[in-house]
């Protein structure tokens, strides 16, 4: 009997040890699985104007330091925590101000307010070499920083970079595809009207410019297939500081002009002086009633995807009636 009791006791102890071992194994397995399921912060590398930058995770607190970059983020569904002030508006362009509520102003494109940027504790800063190259190292010390190269001409180049930087490359492709479809549709609707020569002039404080093809609006006109007057059919930006002797170079089948006003009233006075000049009144576009004043923010200053689409709205409305 004693021997049987000893055997039973030994078996009971062995059973408990086996159960305990199984329990430990399950806990370790569960723990290992838990470790596997724990989220990892993926990183990606962006090549840009200043080199390469590694970004961890999808940025949630983005500071943008160009006007066209602000439009890019908004089109991608990203509301920045900070942005540079618009060149016109207080502080944002009229066509984006409803989307910018709560966004902090961090200076202008040049100069930006580095201290204000740091206070926002961004996880990504997007800027531009042309505007902010000298402070790149300061910005990089605050957060991962990506710079575009230039601000002139084709807006899509910078847009694609910004989309990659905020980890929304696919969304960016959709935005561009939608825009390209608008270009194709409008071009088809206009038909032979794109053969009309389109002239563009800008009035600024102390400066009058005749715009060529490598400008924001010039690129869009070319995408639609519009002809340009011989004096403007050039692959550079613009003729700056034009004198009144150059007014004949402003002629075209249709003339669009836009005025950048800095609040001094100087540009508006310059505009009035020039459009009332006998040489200007003698332009064929004036005589045929084909001169149109358009919004400078849309046709030039903002320079982004939202402005590009609004410029298409203007062209559709005006040119379909020609």
Where are these regions (language model features)?
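Bacterial signal peptide processing site
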Residues: 23-26
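Extracytoplasmic ligand-binding site segments that recognize negatively charged/polar headgroups
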Residues: 90-92, 132, 149-161, 197-219, ...
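Extracytoplasmic substrate-binding proteins
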Residues: 134-205, 302, 306-322
């Amino acid at each position: 009997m004693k021997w049987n009791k000893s055997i039973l006791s030994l078996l009971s102890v062995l059973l408990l040890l086996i159960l305990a071992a199984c329990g430990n194994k399950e806990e370790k397995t569960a723990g290992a699985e838990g470790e596997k399921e724990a989220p990892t912060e993926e990183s990606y590398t962006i090549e840009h104007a200043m080199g390469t930058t590694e970004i961890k995770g999808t940025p949630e607190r983005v500071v943008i330091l160009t006007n066209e970059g602000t439009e890019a983020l908004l089109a991608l569904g990203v509301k920045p925590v900070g942005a540079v002030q618009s060149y016109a508006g207080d502080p944002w362009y009229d066509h984006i101000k409803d989307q910018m509520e709560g966004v902090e102003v961090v200076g202008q494109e040049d100069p930006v307010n580095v201290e204000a940027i740091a206070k926002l504790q961004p996880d990504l800063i997007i800027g531009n070499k042309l505007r902010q190259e000298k402070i790149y190292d300061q910005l990089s010390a605050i957060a991962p920083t990506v710079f575009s190269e230039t601000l002139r001409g084709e807006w899509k180049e910078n847009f694609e970079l910004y989309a990659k930087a905020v980890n929304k490359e696919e969304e960016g492709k959709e935005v561009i595809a939608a825009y390209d479809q608008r270009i194709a549709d409008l071009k088809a609707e206009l038909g032979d009207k794109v053969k009309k020569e389109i002239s563009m002039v800008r009035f600024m404080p102390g400066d009058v410019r005749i715009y060529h093809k490598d400008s924001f609006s010039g690129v869009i006109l070319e995408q639609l297939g519009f002809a340009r007057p011989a004096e403007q059919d050039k692959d550079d930006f613009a003729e700056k500081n034009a004198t009144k002797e150059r007014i004949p170079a402003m002629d075209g089948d249709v003339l669009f002009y836009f005025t950048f006003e800095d609040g001094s009233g100087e540009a508006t006075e310059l505009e009035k002086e020039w459009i009332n000049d006998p040489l200007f009144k003698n332009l064929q576009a004036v005589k045929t009633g084909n001169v149109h004043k358009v919004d400078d923010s849309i046709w030039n200053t903002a320079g982004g995807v939202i402005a590009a689409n609004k410029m298409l709205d203007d062209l559709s409305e005006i040119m379909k009636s020609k």
